[in-house]
Curated annotation (Swiss-Prot):
Transmembrane domains' residue ranges: none
Highest classification ranks of the organism: Eukaryota, Fungi, Dikarya, Ascomycota, Pezizomycotina
Protein name from the UniProt record: Transcription factor FG08080
Protein species of origin: Gibberella zeae (strain ATCC MYA-4620 / CBS 123657 / FGSC 9075 / NRRL 31084 / PH-1)
InterPro entries for the chain: Zn2-C6_fun-type_DNA-bd_sf, Zn2Cys6_DnaBD
SUPFAM superfamilies: Zn2/Cys6 DNA-binding domain
CDD domains: GAL4
Length: 415
């Protein structure tokens, strides 16, 4: 049951509801109790009662001798309201000076948020819930809480709830951003290149020829002797990641064209192109390291050279053994490496002098070149031809590409 009672001086001075326990009406209010302050109630002046603040003990709430009417108890707590409607919490503008005042006002209400009965519809219902300043939900009136930044995919997602804390749409956009993914790809390539330069690997285990028709194995199981480090598996995983990033970028451009949205700015495309070329040159450095290692081992280690030249599976025709040519391992290795990188070269739209793969017919893309096929891309490649490649002794990018092509030819002609 709601019963009007005078508010204490502290609650009245700060224009807040004076809330008391329903069973202890004569004790201090909840707000003064938590603040450990004296709860002084300034009753209306009566004859013979002195004015002022000298006799504070006489201004405490006297115990009520009147017996309240008998009523069925309800689970909703009884809240003591202020006797003046003019000092209730204002809604529009009183707390708009700063969000700090509004938040302090809400915290000073001493609402027991764990008591779900205070929101019960029994009794007088909504009258039992204290008013909350509307400035808490107004970004325009706040000086400390900044409004959320605009998010393009928010309205399209169908989520009409106001964002608080983290913004999942922004996190998704950052994860799917091609620029961030290309930067991550650069880090993976650098780490893989350091591993190639630091660790040795068993060529006879990694380049072992097996028949795919008899128990085809996964790439992770191809290198049993040196399972801890298989350079081909790591290289092909990076190439697959490279293809996925380029496909995401291609789909983003196509989606903008279908929706008649302005295409990506030229500055952004140039930034993507530079990062993609950097990733491609790092991948060529990985290839250069792999081919150099195989050639060095084949020239210095007789067992490796014999394995590369003579480890040919027996092939029969009508029951007769067919003499197999030499260096099947070396030529198969060179062909596989060219086939893998050819898909990346086609997706980038690289011209012939920038490619190391020789079979161009198997990677002809039906779509137009994405990054480097236009005039801007060709001009960018012309500028980069003379640039030095970091970490390589070769003088320029074109020198690196030419060196890798020569090593591929040397591996194919070991016999």
């Amino acid at each position: 049951m709601l019963k009007r009672r005078s508010a204490c001086e502290r609650c009245r001075g700060q224009k807040l509801k004076c809330i008391r326990e329903p069973d202890n009406r004569t004790d201090s209010c909840l707000r003064c109790s938590q603040a450990r302050e004296e709860c002084v109630v300034n009753l209306r002046k009566t004859p013979g009662r002195p004015s002022g603040r000298t006799n504070s003990s006489s201004r405490r709430s006297p115990p009520s001798n009147t017996t309240p009417p008998t009523q069925t108890p309800t689970p909703a707590p009884t809240l003591v309201h202020d006797d003046s409607d003019s000092i209730s919490v204002p809604r529009n503008g009183s707390f708009a000076s700063s969000s700090e005042d509004a938040l302090e006002g809400l915290l000073d209400m001493n609402i027991d948020w764990g008591d779900m009965n205070m929101f019960s519809l029994s009794g007088n219902g909504a009258d039992q819930v204290p008013e909350i300043p509307s400035s808490l939900f107004s970004f325009a009136e706040s000086t400390r809480v900044e409004p959320p930044p605009p998010c393009a995919s928010w309205s399209a997602s169908g989520d009409f709830a106001a964002p608080t804390g983290l913004f999942p749409c922004q996190i998704r956009n950052e994860i799917c951003d091609p620029g961030i993914q290309l930067s991550g790809l650069q880090q993976s390539l650098s780490k893989h290149l350091v591993q190639l330069q630091s660790f040795s690997w068993d060529i006879t285990a990694v380049l072992k020829l097996e028949s795919a028709s008899f128990g085809f194995q996964t790439p992770e199981s191809l290198c049993e002797a040196s399972r801890s480090f298989n350079p081909l598996v790591g290289t092909f995983e990076i190439i697959s990641e490279f293809e996925n990033v380029l496909e995401i970028l291609r789909n983003a451009v196509k989606r903008r064209e279908r929706q008649e949205v302005p295409t990506l700015p030229k500055e952004m495309l140039i930034c993507y192109s530079l990062t993609a070329i950097s990733c491609y040159l790092q991948l060529v450095c990985v290839y250069n390291n792999l081919f150099s290692y195989v050639l060095d081992q084949a020239s210095s280690n007789l067992a490796v050279r014999t394995f590369v030249l003579d480890s040919t599976p027996v092939i029969s025709l009508s029951g007769f053994v067919i003499p197999s040519p030499k260096n099947i391992v070396g030529r198969s290795f060179a062909q596989l490496m060219q086939h893998k990188i050819g898909s990346v070269e086609a997706a980038l739209g690289l011209p012939d002098d920038w490619r190391i793969s020789k079979d161009l017919s198997s990677h002809q893309s039906a779509d137009r070149p994405l990054l480097l096929g236009g005039k801007e891309g060709q001009a960018l490649l012309e500028l980069l031809k003379g640039q030095a490649v970091e970490g390589e002794s070769l003088s320029s990018a074109m020198g690196l590409l030419e060196s890798v092509r020569d090593k591929i030819t040397e591996i194919e002609c070991l016999a």
